[in-house]
Amino acid sequence: MPRLTEQERQDILRYLEADKPLPDKYRFLLFEDKREVELVWNGKTNEVCNVVLPFQVIEQVDEPRAEKPEDASLQLSLFDQRGRQLTGWTNKLIWGDNKLILSSLKNGPLREEIERQGGLKLIYIDPPFDVGANFSMDIEIGSDTFTKKANILEEIAYRDTWGKGADSFIAMIYERLILMRDLLAENGSIYLHIGRNVSHLIRLVCDEVFGSSQSINEITWKRSHAHGDTGQGAIHFGRVTEAILFYSKTDKTQWNAQYTDYSDEIISRDYKYIDEVTGERYRLMPVDGPGGAAKGNPYYEFLGVKGWWRYSESRMKELYDAGEIVLSSTGKSLSRKRFLKDAKGTPVTDLWDDLNRISPTSNERLGYDTQKPEALLERIINASSDEGDLIADFFCGSGTIAAVAEKLGRKWIVCDLGKFAIHTTRKRLIGVQRQLKAEGKDYRAFEILNLGKYERQHYIGVNLNLRQAEQQLSLIHISEPTRPY
Protein backbone atom coordinates (compact mmCIF):
# COMPACT_ATOMS: atom_id res chain seq x y z
CA MET A 1 0.00 0.00 0.00
CA PRO A 2 1.45 3.45 -0.89
CA ARG A 3 2.32 5.79 1.97
CA LEU A 4 -0.26 8.51 2.65
CA THR A 5 0.78 12.12 2.61
CA GLU A 6 0.05 14.28 5.63
CA GLN A 7 -2.59 16.14 3.63
CA GLU A 8 -4.30 12.86 2.74
CA ARG A 9 -4.31 11.81 6.40
CA GLN A 10 -5.92 15.10 7.40
CA ASP A 11 -8.54 14.77 4.65
CA ILE A 12 -9.48 11.27 5.82
CA LEU A 13 -9.85 12.45 9.41
CA ARG A 14 -12.11 15.32 8.34
CA TYR A 15 -14.37 12.94 6.40
CA LEU A 16 -14.57 10.56 9.36
CA GLU A 17 -15.29 13.35 11.87
CA ALA A 18 -18.03 14.70 9.60
CA ASP A 19 -19.46 11.17 9.25
CA LYS A 20 -19.21 11.40 5.47
CA PRO A 21 -18.28 8.60 3.04
CA LEU A 22 -14.71 8.58 1.81
CA PRO A 23 -14.18 9.47 -1.86
CA ASP A 24 -13.28 6.47 -4.03
CA LYS A 25 -9.67 7.57 -4.41
CA TYR A 26 -9.05 6.87 -0.70
CA ARG A 27 -10.52 3.40 -0.98
CA PHE A 28 -7.85 2.54 -3.53
CA LEU A 29 -5.15 4.16 -1.40
CA LEU A 30 -6.18 2.34 1.78
CA PHE A 31 -7.06 -1.08 0.37
CA GLU A 32 -5.01 -3.03 -2.12
CA ASP A 33 -6.91 -4.06 -5.26
CA LYS A 34 -5.20 -5.72 -8.23
CA ARG A 35 -8.05 -4.90 -10.62
CA GLU A 36 -7.18 -2.23 -13.15
CA VAL A 37 -10.83 -1.47 -13.90
CA GLU A 38 -13.84 -1.91 -11.63
CA LEU A 39 -17.52 -1.65 -12.49
CA VAL A 40 -19.51 0.16 -9.81
CA TRP A 41 -23.22 0.93 -9.59
CA ASN A 42 -25.62 2.12 -6.92
CA GLY A 43 -26.36 -0.74 -4.52
CA LYS A 44 -23.62 -3.08 -5.76
CA THR A 45 -22.93 -6.00 -3.43
CA ASN A 46 -20.91 -9.19 -3.68
CA GLU A 47 -23.51 -11.14 -1.71
CA VAL A 48 -25.06 -13.98 -3.70
CA CYS A 49 -28.25 -15.83 -2.82
CA ASN A 50 -27.66 -19.27 -1.28
CA VAL A 51 -31.26 -20.15 -0.40
CA VAL A 52 -32.30 -23.75 -1.03
CA LEU A 53 -36.02 -24.32 -1.48
CA PRO A 54 -37.60 -27.68 -2.33
CA PHE A 55 -38.85 -28.27 -5.85
CA GLN A 56 -42.38 -29.65 -6.08
CA VAL A 57 -43.65 -31.51 -9.14
CA ILE A 58 -46.88 -29.91 -10.35
CA GLU A 59 -47.31 -32.12 -13.40
CA GLN A 60 -45.47 -34.90 -15.21
CA VAL A 61 -46.02 -34.65 -18.97
CA ASP A 62 -45.68 -37.95 -20.84
CA GLU A 63 -44.54 -39.82 -17.76
CA PRO A 64 -42.35 -42.84 -18.68
CA ARG A 65 -44.32 -46.09 -18.63
CA ALA A 66 -43.31 -48.96 -16.37
CA GLU A 67 -41.53 -51.70 -18.27
CA LYS A 68 -43.34 -55.02 -18.58
CA PRO A 69 -41.40 -58.16 -17.56
CA GLU A 70 -41.68 -59.62 -21.06
CA ASP A 71 -40.20 -56.48 -22.64
CA ALA A 72 -36.63 -57.49 -21.79
CA SER A 73 -35.33 -56.11 -25.08
CA LEU A 74 -36.50 -52.63 -24.10
CA GLN A 75 -34.48 -52.59 -20.90
CA LEU A 76 -31.32 -51.83 -22.86
CA SER A 77 -32.76 -48.56 -24.21
CA LEU A 78 -33.86 -45.25 -22.71
CA PHE A 79 -36.82 -45.17 -25.11
CA ASP A 80 -39.57 -47.60 -26.08
CA GLN A 81 -40.50 -48.57 -29.63
CA ARG A 82 -42.62 -45.43 -30.01
CA GLY A 83 -39.76 -43.17 -28.91
CA ARG A 84 -41.22 -42.50 -25.46
CA GLN A 85 -38.67 -42.16 -22.66
CA LEU A 86 -38.45 -45.04 -20.19
CA THR A 87 -35.65 -43.96 -17.89
CA GLY A 88 -32.93 -41.35 -17.42
CA TRP A 89 -33.04 -37.57 -17.19
CA THR A 90 -36.45 -35.86 -17.18
CA ASN A 91 -36.51 -32.34 -18.62
CA LYS A 92 -37.64 -29.56 -16.29
CA LEU A 93 -39.96 -26.59 -16.76
CA ILE A 94 -39.85 -24.56 -13.54
CA TRP A 95 -42.24 -21.82 -12.45
CA GLY A 96 -40.79 -19.22 -10.12
CA ASP A 97 -38.19 -16.52 -9.50
CA ASN A 98 -35.03 -17.48 -11.34
CA LYS A 99 -32.74 -16.23 -8.58
CA LEU A 100 -34.23 -18.68 -6.11
CA ILE A 101 -34.32 -21.38 -8.78
CA LEU A 102 -30.64 -20.86 -9.62
CA SER A 103 -29.67 -20.84 -5.96
CA SER A 104 -31.67 -24.02 -5.29
CA LEU A 105 -30.18 -25.75 -8.35
CA LYS A 106 -26.67 -24.76 -7.35
CA ASN A 107 -26.88 -25.59 -3.65
CA GLY A 108 -29.65 -28.20 -3.49
CA PRO A 109 -29.98 -31.92 -4.27
CA LEU A 110 -30.66 -31.34 -7.98
CA ARG A 111 -27.05 -30.17 -8.37
CA GLU A 112 -25.84 -33.77 -8.13
CA GLU A 113 -28.29 -34.84 -10.84
CA ILE A 114 -27.09 -32.00 -13.08
CA GLU A 115 -23.46 -33.03 -12.56
CA ARG A 116 -24.32 -36.62 -13.51
CA GLN A 117 -25.45 -35.29 -16.89
CA GLY A 118 -22.05 -33.64 -17.38
CA GLY A 119 -23.13 -30.27 -16.01
CA LEU A 120 -24.76 -27.42 -17.89
CA LYS A 121 -22.97 -27.15 -21.23
CA LEU A 122 -24.90 -24.15 -22.51
CA ILE A 123 -27.02 -21.36 -21.06
CA TYR A 124 -28.99 -18.96 -23.25
CA ILE A 125 -30.91 -16.08 -21.69
CA ASP A 126 -33.04 -13.35 -23.20
CA PRO A 127 -33.91 -11.19 -20.17
CA PRO A 128 -36.40 -8.31 -20.38
CA PHE A 129 -34.23 -5.33 -21.30
CA ASP A 130 -36.74 -2.58 -22.05
CA VAL A 131 -35.85 0.00 -19.38
CA GLY A 132 -38.93 1.75 -18.06
CA ALA A 133 -41.45 -0.60 -19.69
CA ASN A 134 -44.50 -1.79 -17.76
CA PHE A 135 -44.06 -5.33 -19.16
CA SER A 136 -47.61 -5.77 -20.27
CA MET A 137 -47.81 -8.02 -23.31
CA ASP A 138 -49.91 -8.11 -26.45
CA ILE A 139 -51.24 -11.63 -27.09
CA GLU A 140 -52.82 -12.73 -30.35
CA ILE A 141 -55.82 -15.05 -30.06
CA GLY A 142 -57.28 -15.80 -33.45
CA SER A 143 -57.72 -12.51 -35.27
CA ASP A 144 -57.91 -10.49 -32.04
CA THR A 145 -55.14 -8.98 -29.92
CA PHE A 146 -55.43 -8.71 -26.14
CA THR A 147 -53.14 -6.99 -23.66
CA LYS A 148 -51.97 -9.24 -20.83
CA LYS A 149 -51.11 -7.33 -17.67
CA ALA A 150 -48.37 -8.57 -15.34
CA ASN A 151 -49.63 -10.48 -12.28
CA ILE A 152 -48.65 -9.43 -8.77
CA LEU A 153 -45.46 -11.52 -8.73
CA GLU A 154 -44.41 -10.20 -12.12
CA GLU A 155 -45.20 -6.61 -11.12
CA ILE A 156 -43.05 -6.88 -8.01
CA ALA A 157 -40.24 -8.56 -9.93
CA TYR A 158 -40.28 -5.98 -12.72
CA ARG A 159 -40.55 -3.12 -10.24
CA ASP A 160 -37.50 -4.44 -8.37
CA THR A 161 -35.66 -4.98 -11.66
CA TRP A 162 -36.37 -1.57 -13.21
CA GLY A 163 -37.29 0.53 -10.16
CA LYS A 164 -34.00 2.43 -10.38
CA GLY A 165 -33.54 2.07 -14.11
CA ALA A 166 -30.31 0.53 -15.34
CA ASP A 167 -28.81 0.28 -11.82
CA SER A 168 -31.41 -2.18 -10.58
CA PHE A 169 -31.30 -4.17 -13.83
CA ILE A 170 -27.52 -4.55 -13.57
CA ALA A 171 -27.81 -5.59 -9.91
CA MET A 172 -30.43 -8.18 -10.88
CA ILE A 173 -28.45 -9.69 -13.74
CA TYR A 174 -25.10 -9.56 -11.90
CA GLU A 175 -26.17 -11.87 -9.09
CA ARG A 176 -27.87 -14.27 -11.48
CA LEU A 177 -24.83 -14.40 -13.78
CA ILE A 178 -22.64 -15.42 -10.84
CA LEU A 179 -25.06 -18.26 -10.03
CA MET A 180 -25.19 -19.30 -13.70
CA ARG A 181 -21.39 -19.26 -13.97
CA ASP A 182 -21.13 -21.59 -10.99
CA LEU A 183 -23.65 -23.99 -12.57
CA LEU A 184 -21.86 -24.14 -15.94
CA ALA A 185 -19.67 -27.12 -16.77
CA GLU A 186 -15.97 -26.35 -17.13
CA ASN A 187 -16.34 -26.43 -20.92
CA GLY A 188 -19.68 -24.64 -20.84
CA SER A 189 -20.66 -21.31 -22.35
CA ILE A 190 -23.37 -18.67 -22.05
CA TYR A 191 -25.16 -16.50 -24.61
CA LEU A 192 -26.90 -13.31 -23.43
CA HIS A 193 -29.44 -11.80 -25.82
CA ILE A 194 -29.48 -8.09 -25.01
CA GLY A 195 -30.99 -4.92 -26.49
CA ARG A 196 -29.00 -1.90 -27.60
CA ASN A 197 -30.00 0.18 -24.57
CA VAL A 198 -28.13 -2.01 -22.07
CA SER A 199 -25.74 -4.18 -24.11
CA HIS A 200 -22.73 -1.94 -23.43
CA LEU A 201 -23.35 -2.15 -19.69
CA ILE A 202 -24.02 -5.88 -19.60
CA ARG A 203 -20.79 -6.56 -21.48
CA LEU A 204 -18.90 -4.87 -18.63
CA VAL A 205 -20.83 -6.96 -16.10
CA CYS A 206 -19.96 -10.15 -18.01
CA ASP A 207 -16.30 -9.12 -18.13
CA GLU A 208 -16.36 -8.84 -14.35
CA VAL A 209 -18.18 -12.15 -13.77
CA PHE A 210 -16.45 -14.33 -16.39
CA GLY A 211 -13.30 -12.31 -17.13
CA SER A 212 -12.71 -10.26 -20.26
CA SER A 213 -10.49 -13.05 -21.62
CA GLN A 214 -13.56 -15.32 -21.76
CA SER A 215 -15.44 -12.98 -24.08
CA ILE A 216 -15.65 -14.94 -27.33
CA ASN A 217 -17.97 -12.87 -29.50
CA GLU A 218 -20.39 -10.00 -29.50
CA ILE A 219 -22.80 -11.29 -32.12
CA THR A 220 -24.90 -8.78 -34.05
CA TRP A 221 -28.25 -10.22 -35.07
CA LYS A 222 -29.95 -8.29 -37.86
CA ARG A 223 -33.45 -9.27 -36.86
CA SER A 224 -35.25 -7.28 -39.54
CA HIS A 225 -34.69 -6.22 -43.12
CA ALA A 226 -37.32 -3.50 -42.86
CA HIS A 227 -36.55 0.07 -43.85
CA GLY A 228 -35.69 2.63 -41.19
CA ASP A 229 -38.46 4.61 -39.51
CA THR A 230 -37.38 8.01 -40.85
CA GLY A 231 -40.75 8.31 -42.55
CA GLN A 232 -42.39 8.38 -39.11
CA GLY A 233 -40.24 11.32 -38.04
CA ALA A 234 -37.29 9.43 -36.51
CA ILE A 235 -33.97 11.28 -36.36
CA HIS A 236 -31.82 8.15 -36.24
CA PHE A 237 -30.81 5.31 -38.54
CA GLY A 238 -33.19 2.36 -38.58
CA ARG A 239 -32.65 0.14 -35.54
CA VAL A 240 -32.76 -3.41 -36.83
CA THR A 241 -30.16 -5.24 -34.72
CA GLU A 242 -29.77 -6.81 -31.29
CA ALA A 243 -26.63 -8.03 -29.52
CA ILE A 244 -25.89 -11.55 -28.33
CA LEU A 245 -22.91 -11.72 -25.95
CA PHE A 246 -21.06 -15.04 -26.06
CA TYR A 247 -18.85 -15.95 -23.06
CA SER A 248 -17.14 -19.14 -21.94
CA LYS A 249 -16.49 -20.31 -18.40
CA THR A 250 -12.91 -21.45 -19.13
CA ASP A 251 -10.55 -21.81 -22.08
CA LYS A 252 -11.87 -25.36 -22.67
CA THR A 253 -14.98 -24.16 -24.47
CA GLN A 254 -17.01 -26.72 -26.35
CA TRP A 255 -17.29 -25.54 -29.96
CA ASN A 256 -18.71 -26.79 -33.25
CA ALA A 257 -18.11 -24.44 -36.18
CA GLN A 258 -21.26 -23.47 -38.07
CA TYR A 259 -21.66 -22.89 -41.80
CA THR A 260 -24.22 -21.41 -44.16
CA ASP A 261 -24.89 -22.54 -47.72
CA TYR A 262 -22.83 -20.84 -50.40
CA SER A 263 -24.54 -18.00 -52.23
CA ASP A 264 -25.21 -18.34 -55.95
CA GLU A 265 -22.48 -15.76 -56.53
CA ILE A 266 -19.86 -17.84 -54.69
CA ILE A 267 -20.93 -21.04 -56.45
CA SER A 268 -20.73 -19.51 -59.93
CA ARG A 269 -17.41 -17.81 -59.14
CA ASP A 270 -15.53 -20.53 -57.24
CA TYR A 271 -17.15 -23.77 -58.42
CA LYS A 272 -17.15 -22.97 -62.12
CA TYR A 273 -16.03 -26.38 -63.41
CA ILE A 274 -18.39 -29.27 -64.17
CA ASP A 275 -17.18 -32.88 -63.88
CA GLU A 276 -17.71 -34.66 -67.19
CA VAL A 277 -18.58 -37.96 -65.54
CA THR A 278 -20.76 -36.99 -62.58
CA GLY A 279 -21.98 -33.56 -63.68
CA GLU A 280 -20.97 -32.21 -60.24
CA ARG A 281 -19.59 -28.71 -59.77
CA TYR A 282 -16.02 -28.43 -58.47
CA ARG A 283 -13.13 -26.04 -57.93
CA LEU A 284 -9.38 -26.63 -58.34
CA MET A 285 -7.18 -26.52 -55.25
CA PRO A 286 -3.35 -26.57 -55.14
CA VAL A 287 -1.55 -29.76 -54.13
CA ASP A 288 1.99 -28.38 -53.95
CA GLY A 289 3.64 -28.19 -50.53
CA PRO A 290 4.78 -24.65 -49.65
CA GLY A 291 7.89 -24.64 -47.48
CA GLY A 292 9.27 -27.82 -49.00
CA ALA A 293 11.42 -30.02 -46.78
CA ALA A 294 11.39 -27.42 -43.99
CA LYS A 295 7.67 -28.13 -43.55
CA GLY A 296 8.13 -31.88 -43.88
CA ASN A 297 6.59 -32.07 -47.35
CA PRO A 298 7.72 -34.97 -49.60
CA TYR A 299 9.53 -34.48 -52.92
CA TYR A 300 8.80 -36.73 -55.90
CA GLU A 301 7.72 -36.77 -59.54
CA PHE A 302 4.04 -37.31 -60.41
CA LEU A 303 2.52 -37.22 -63.91
CA GLY A 304 5.82 -35.81 -65.15
CA VAL A 305 5.82 -32.92 -62.67
CA LYS A 306 8.58 -32.78 -60.04
CA GLY A 307 8.10 -30.87 -56.82
CA TRP A 308 7.29 -30.71 -53.13
CA TRP A 309 3.78 -31.96 -52.42
CA ARG A 310 1.33 -31.72 -49.52
CA TYR A 311 0.37 -35.41 -49.93
CA SER A 312 2.48 -38.55 -49.76
CA GLU A 313 3.07 -40.32 -53.08
CA SER A 314 0.70 -43.15 -52.13
CA ARG A 315 -2.04 -40.67 -51.15
CA MET A 316 -1.54 -38.74 -54.40
CA LYS A 317 -1.97 -42.01 -56.30
CA GLU A 318 -5.25 -42.71 -54.45
CA LEU A 319 -6.60 -39.27 -55.34
CA TYR A 320 -5.56 -39.70 -58.96
CA ASP A 321 -7.28 -43.08 -59.19
CA ALA A 322 -10.41 -41.45 -57.76
CA GLY A 323 -10.34 -38.89 -60.56
CA GLU A 324 -9.51 -35.96 -58.27
CA ILE A 325 -6.00 -35.01 -59.51
CA VAL A 326 -5.88 -32.84 -62.64
CA LEU A 327 -2.84 -32.03 -64.81
CA SER A 328 -2.87 -28.47 -66.16
CA SER A 329 -3.10 -27.82 -69.90
CA THR A 330 0.57 -26.76 -69.87
CA GLY A 331 1.61 -30.02 -68.20
CA LYS A 332 3.57 -28.09 -65.56
CA SER A 333 1.29 -28.15 -62.51
CA LEU A 334 -1.21 -30.33 -60.66
CA SER A 335 -4.46 -29.48 -58.89
CA ARG A 336 -7.09 -31.34 -56.92
CA LYS A 337 -10.83 -31.28 -57.57
CA ARG A 338 -12.92 -30.14 -54.59
CA PHE A 339 -16.58 -30.86 -55.22
CA LEU A 340 -19.35 -28.52 -54.14
CA LYS A 341 -21.30 -31.40 -52.59
CA ASP A 342 -18.41 -32.02 -50.16
CA ALA A 343 -18.03 -28.37 -49.12
CA LYS A 344 -19.26 -27.30 -45.68
CA GLY A 345 -20.27 -23.85 -46.86
CA THR A 346 -19.37 -20.37 -45.66
CA PRO A 347 -18.22 -20.19 -42.00
CA VAL A 348 -20.66 -18.19 -39.88
CA THR A 349 -19.23 -14.88 -38.63
CA ASP A 350 -20.40 -12.67 -35.76
CA LEU A 351 -22.79 -10.82 -38.10
CA TRP A 352 -26.00 -12.83 -38.38
CA ASP A 353 -28.02 -11.24 -41.16
CA ASP A 354 -29.52 -14.44 -42.55
CA LEU A 355 -32.01 -15.16 -39.74
CA ASN A 356 -35.09 -12.96 -39.86
CA ARG A 357 -37.44 -12.43 -36.95
CA ILE A 358 -40.70 -14.36 -36.95
CA SER A 359 -43.09 -13.05 -39.57
CA PRO A 360 -46.81 -12.50 -38.87
CA THR A 361 -47.64 -15.51 -41.07
CA SER A 362 -44.99 -17.89 -39.71
CA ASN A 363 -46.09 -21.30 -38.42
CA GLU A 364 -43.79 -20.72 -35.44
CA ARG A 365 -45.67 -17.65 -34.29
CA LEU A 366 -47.34 -18.08 -30.89
CA GLY A 367 -48.49 -14.49 -30.39
CA TYR A 368 -45.72 -14.01 -27.82
CA ASP A 369 -44.26 -10.53 -28.28
CA THR A 370 -40.59 -11.35 -27.56
CA GLN A 371 -40.52 -14.77 -29.27
CA LYS A 372 -37.27 -15.53 -31.13
CA PRO A 373 -37.03 -17.65 -34.30
CA GLU A 374 -36.10 -21.30 -33.84
CA ALA A 375 -33.32 -20.99 -36.45
CA LEU A 376 -31.52 -18.50 -34.20
CA LEU A 377 -31.53 -20.88 -31.23
CA GLU A 378 -30.71 -23.85 -33.44
CA ARG A 379 -27.47 -22.17 -34.50
CA ILE A 380 -26.49 -21.39 -30.92
CA ILE A 381 -27.33 -24.88 -29.63
CA ASN A 382 -25.49 -26.63 -32.46
CA ALA A 383 -22.42 -24.40 -32.01
CA SER A 384 -21.99 -24.85 -28.27
CA SER A 385 -23.40 -28.28 -27.37
CA ASP A 386 -23.61 -31.85 -28.61
CA GLU A 387 -26.53 -34.26 -28.74
CA GLY A 388 -27.36 -35.48 -25.22
CA ASP A 389 -25.91 -32.39 -23.51
CA LEU A 390 -27.84 -30.45 -20.85
CA ILE A 391 -28.70 -26.82 -21.64
CA ALA A 392 -30.76 -24.15 -19.88
CA ASP A 393 -32.70 -20.91 -20.24
CA PHE A 394 -33.64 -19.03 -17.06
CA PHE A 395 -35.87 -16.44 -18.81
CA CYS A 396 -37.64 -18.93 -21.08
CA GLY A 397 -40.59 -16.81 -22.26
CA SER A 398 -42.36 -18.79 -24.99
CA GLY A 399 -40.03 -21.79 -24.55
CA THR A 400 -38.12 -21.58 -27.83
CA ILE A 401 -34.86 -22.89 -26.34
CA ALA A 402 -36.66 -25.94 -24.88
CA ALA A 403 -38.54 -26.65 -28.12
CA VAL A 404 -35.39 -26.48 -30.25
CA ALA A 405 -33.36 -28.42 -27.67
CA GLU A 406 -35.92 -31.24 -27.73
CA LYS A 407 -35.85 -31.39 -31.52
CA LEU A 408 -32.03 -31.49 -31.51
CA GLY A 409 -31.81 -34.23 -28.87
CA ARG A 410 -30.57 -32.09 -25.98
CA LYS A 411 -31.68 -32.26 -22.37
CA TRP A 412 -32.97 -29.03 -20.87
CA ILE A 413 -33.95 -26.95 -17.86
CA VAL A 414 -36.01 -23.80 -18.41
CA CYS A 415 -37.86 -21.49 -16.07
CA ASP A 416 -39.91 -18.31 -15.97
CA LEU A 417 -41.72 -16.22 -13.40
CA GLY A 418 -44.74 -15.63 -15.62
CA LYS A 419 -47.63 -18.05 -15.45
CA PHE A 420 -48.51 -17.32 -19.08
CA ALA A 421 -44.94 -18.20 -20.12
CA ILE A 422 -45.19 -21.55 -18.33
CA HIS A 423 -48.54 -22.35 -19.97
CA THR A 424 -47.24 -21.29 -23.40
CA THR A 425 -44.09 -23.38 -23.04
CA ARG A 426 -46.00 -26.42 -21.75
CA LYS A 427 -48.40 -26.37 -24.70
CA ARG A 428 -45.56 -25.84 -27.15
CA LEU A 429 -43.51 -28.75 -25.81
CA ILE A 430 -46.46 -31.12 -25.93
CA GLY A 431 -46.76 -30.15 -29.59
CA VAL A 432 -43.06 -30.91 -30.10
CA GLN A 433 -43.51 -34.34 -28.50
CA ARG A 434 -46.41 -35.09 -30.83
CA GLN A 435 -44.36 -33.96 -33.83
CA LEU A 436 -41.40 -36.14 -32.87
CA LYS A 437 -43.68 -39.11 -32.22
CA ALA A 438 -45.29 -38.70 -35.66
CA GLU A 439 -41.81 -38.63 -37.22
CA GLY A 440 -40.78 -41.78 -35.35
CA LYS A 441 -38.14 -39.93 -33.31
CA ASP A 442 -37.24 -40.15 -29.62
CA TYR A 443 -38.65 -37.62 -27.17
CA ARG A 444 -38.22 -37.07 -23.45
CA ALA A 445 -40.72 -36.62 -20.66
CA PHE A 446 -40.74 -33.27 -18.91
CA GLU A 447 -42.01 -32.20 -15.54
CA ILE A 448 -43.42 -28.87 -14.41
CA LEU A 449 -42.02 -27.78 -11.05
CA ASN A 450 -42.27 -24.90 -8.64
CA LEU A 451 -40.19 -24.07 -5.59
CA GLY A 452 -42.60 -25.38 -3.04
CA LYS A 453 -45.65 -24.02 -1.29
CA TYR A 454 -44.01 -20.96 0.24
CA GLU A 455 -41.76 -19.86 -2.62
CA ARG A 456 -43.99 -16.96 -3.65
CA GLN A 457 -44.40 -15.60 -0.13
CA HIS A 458 -40.64 -15.93 0.37
CA TYR A 459 -39.98 -14.16 -2.91
CA ILE A 460 -42.23 -11.16 -2.33
CA GLY A 461 -41.20 -10.75 1.31
CA VAL A 462 -44.31 -11.85 3.22
CA ASN A 463 -43.58 -12.83 6.83
CA LEU A 464 -44.63 -16.49 7.08
CA ASN A 465 -44.99 -16.20 10.88
CA LEU A 466 -48.02 -13.93 10.46
CA ARG A 467 -51.57 -15.25 10.59
CA GLN A 468 -53.16 -15.85 7.17
CA ALA A 469 -55.26 -12.66 7.31
CA GLU A 470 -52.19 -10.61 8.22
CA GLN A 471 -50.24 -12.23 5.36
CA GLN A 472 -52.97 -11.16 2.95
CA LEU A 473 -52.79 -7.56 4.21
CA SER A 474 -49.01 -7.67 3.90
CA LEU A 475 -49.34 -8.91 0.33
CA ILE A 476 -51.67 -6.01 -0.54
CA HIS A 477 -49.23 -3.50 0.97
CA ILE A 478 -46.30 -4.95 -0.98
CA SER A 479 -48.18 -4.82 -4.27
CA GLU A 480 -49.75 -1.39 -3.60
CA PRO A 481 -47.46 0.44 -1.13
CA THR A 482 -49.45 3.71 -1.34
CA ARG A 483 -52.80 2.07 -0.55
CA PRO A 484 -54.01 2.67 3.04
CA TYR A 485 -55.15 -0.31 5.11
Would you name each region that the model predicts?
Residues 105-108, 176-177, 319-347, 351, ...:
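Phosphate/ATP-binding catalytic cores across multiple sugar-kinase/actin-like superfamilies
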Residues 476-485:
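Single conserved hydrophobic/aromatic residue that forms the stacking wall/gate
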Residues 161-221:
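Conserved Class I SAM-dependent methyltransferase catalytic core
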Residues 60, 373-448:
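Conserved S-adenosyl-L-methionine
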Residues 226-291, 458, 466:
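Flexible, glycine-/basic-rich loop-and-beta segments that form/coincide
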Residues 118-137, 206, 391-405, 415:
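Conserved proline-anchored active-site loop of SAM-dependent methyltransferases
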Residues 1-125, 129-179, 187, 455, ...:
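DnaQ-like (DEDDh/DEDDy) 3′-5′ exonuclease domain used for proofreading
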Residues 258-343:
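N-terminal auxiliary segments of SAM/dcSAM-dependent transferases
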